[in-house]
C-alpha cells in the first residue's frame, strides 16, 4: 500500500515537472521570439552597424533608408548617458534628459530635433517604426557631442565618445542675425515647407559670405545697391512677427546647414513682376512655390 502511494506521488511529480518544463520552454520561446523579431522597417531599407570607440554597439538595430542612417532613439541615447524618457502622446514627442546635462526633444514626423537650445535639421523625418522612434544619426551625434564618420569598407557608422559630458553646449545664436533672418524667411516663405524656408535663409547667408553683397544679415536684407532686393522690405512685412517654423528654419541655417552654398536668388514665378533672375541666372532647383538660382 505504501509502495503504491509512493509510486503515485512519483508519477504526479514527474507529470508536474514535465508540465513545468514545458511551460518554461514555451515562455522562453515566446520571449526569444519577441527579442528576435525584427522591427517592421520600410521597404528599401538596408541594415547597417554602429561602432563606438571601435566596439560594435548597435548590431542589427539600424538601417539606411533613403540614403540616411536611422537609429533607435532609446538605444542610441543610452550608449552615452543614463537617460530618462518621457512620451507626450498629444504632441507625438519624446523628451530625453541625460545626467550629463542634455535636454533633447524629438517629435515624430518632424524634420529636426531640439538639443539644449539648438535646432538640428534631420534631412529625413523622424520615423515611428513598430512603436519605436527612429532618428537620423548625424543630428543625434551632434546632440551628444559625438564625433561621427562613415566607414565605407565596413559600410558602418563609427562614433567616438566625447571627451567631456555627452551633451552639446547650450546654443548661443547672434540675436540680430536670428531676429532679421527669421523675419525675412517668414515674410518670403511663410506657408512653405521647412526645407523651402531653410533655402530662403541659405540665400541670405550665402550673400553674407559673398564679396558682392554686404557682410551682415541686416545689410543683405536692406541692401538697395541695385534696387530693393527683397520685396518684404518695400511692403513692410519684414517687420511682422515671424512664424514659429521660420524661427526654427533660421536657427537651422545659423547652425550651418545648407541646401546649397551657391544659391543667391529665388523667385516665385507665378507672382514675380520681373523675369530678370530667370533670364540671367543659372537655375538650381525648385522647392514649393520658389525657384532658386545661382
Predicted regions span which residues?
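Primary recognition of N-terminal secretory signal peptides and signal-anchoring hydrophobic helices
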Residues: 2-182
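Bacterial extracytoplasmic/cell-wall-associated proteins, especially those involved in peptidoglycan
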Residues: 165-294
Amino acid at each position: 500500500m505504501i509502495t503504491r502511494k509512493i509510486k503515485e506521488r512519483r508519477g504526479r511529480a514527474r507529470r508536474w515537472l514535465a508540465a513545468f518544463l514545458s511551460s518554461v520552454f514555451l515562455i522562453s520561446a515566446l520571449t526569444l521570439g519577441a527579442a528576435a523579431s525584427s522591427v517592421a522597417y520600410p521597404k528599401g531599407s538596408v541594415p547597417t552597424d554602429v561602432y563606438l570607440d571601435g566596439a560594435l554597439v548597435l548590431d542589427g538595430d539600424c538601417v539606411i533608408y533613403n540614403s540616411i542612417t536611422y537609429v533607435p532613439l532609446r538605444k542610441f541615447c543610452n550608449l552615452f548617458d543614463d537617460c530618462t524618457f518621457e512620451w507626450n502622446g498629444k504632441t507625438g514627442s519624446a523628451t530625453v534628459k541625460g545626467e550629463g546635462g542634455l535636454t533633447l526633444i524629438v517629435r515624430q514626423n518632424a524634420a529636426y530635433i531640439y538639443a539644449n537650445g539648438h535646432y538640428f535639421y534631420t534631412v529625413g523625418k523622424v520615423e515611428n517604426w513598430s512603436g519605436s522612434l527612429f532618428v537620423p544619426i548625424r543630428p543625434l551625434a551632434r546632440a551628444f557631442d559625438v564625433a561621427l564618420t562613415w566607414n565605407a569598407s565596413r559600410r558602418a557608422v563609427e562614433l567616438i565618445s566625447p571627451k567631456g559630458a555627452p551633451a552639446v553646449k547650450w546654443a548661443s545664436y547672434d540675436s540680430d542675425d536670428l531676429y532679421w533672418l527669421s523675419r525675412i524667411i517668414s515674410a518670403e516663405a511663410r506657408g512653405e515647407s521647412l526645407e523651402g524656408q531653410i533655402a530662403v535663409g541659405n540665400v541670405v547667408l550665402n550673400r553674407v559670405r559673398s564679396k558682392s553683397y554686404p557682410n551682415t544679415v541686416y545689410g543683405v536684407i536692406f541692401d538697395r545697391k541695385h534696387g530693393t532686393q527683397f520685396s518684404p522690405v518695400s511692403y513692410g512685412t519684414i517687420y511682422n512677427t515671424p512664424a514659429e517654423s521660420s524661427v526654427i528654419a533660421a536657427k537651422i541655417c545659423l547652425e550651418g546647414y545648407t541646401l546649397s552654398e551657391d544659391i543667391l536668388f529665388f523667385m516665385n514665378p507665378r507672382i514675380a513682376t520681373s523675369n530678370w533672375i530667370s533670364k540671367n541666372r543659372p537655375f538650381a532647383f525648385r522647392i514649393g512655390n520658389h525657384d532658386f538660382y545661382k
